[in-house]
């Protein structure tokens, strides 16, 4: 009896041990399954997040591209730059462009340098209240109705044009036209914001004592501080007259004072608007001596 009882105890212990091991295995597998599920869930969530991020990035890029693409679409009845240039002188024109700089305002008339992605438009003495003039910060989009005209080679929209402010903004990048100086292609960039690099300052005239000077007040030296500055620069043996238009950049500006400090022989880089007067006569807004 003792032997059987002991045998029975041994058998029961083995069964209990086996049952305990089986339960441990089940729990272990369950835990492992949960862990794998967690990893799978985390991987799925990460993939979903990454996909969402990529989708958002793609959408943002698409939106930006669309904005750039439609930024210069013309409204109904508005000319493209090509159509504007092809229009006859003294004909009515309607254009949309972006203010790049304001030259002056006086007695409800504003003179503006404007540009779109295709070309530039000089607007002379447009009808403009002082209140509206203050709104015409660089980049402002305007729709202009007026008459195309030409004055001493400068194609412009004549005095009396009207405009309305529209939604949109654009600042034109500077275009280096140094290599186009002296070529027939230069005029195709008329009124655009441009750069000239590596030019040499030449004598602009002489002072009262007969000494060569690097600039003149007014084209003939008849002016004084605060008037337009005229100076000559050369490239490849050709000399050109550039101007600091005092209405655009007065005698408190960096460029005005930079030109007053030029020395004959200086090498300079410049930026400004490609104005025309009996030939190229840029209105310079920046001068850097190298």
Annotate the PLM regions:
Residues 37-85:
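N-terminal, intrinsically disordered, polar/charged segments of Gram-positive cell-envelope systems
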Residues 1-11:
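Short, Lys/Arg-enriched N-terminal segments with co-localized hydrophobic residues
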Residues 23-24:
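Repetitive helical segments and hydrophobic/amphipathic motifs
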Residues 68-290:
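OB-fold single-stranded nucleic acid-binding module
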Residues 28-31:
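C-terminal motif of bacterial Sec signal peptides marking the signal peptidase cleavage site
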Residues 10-19:
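Bacterial N-terminal signal peptides that target proteins for export
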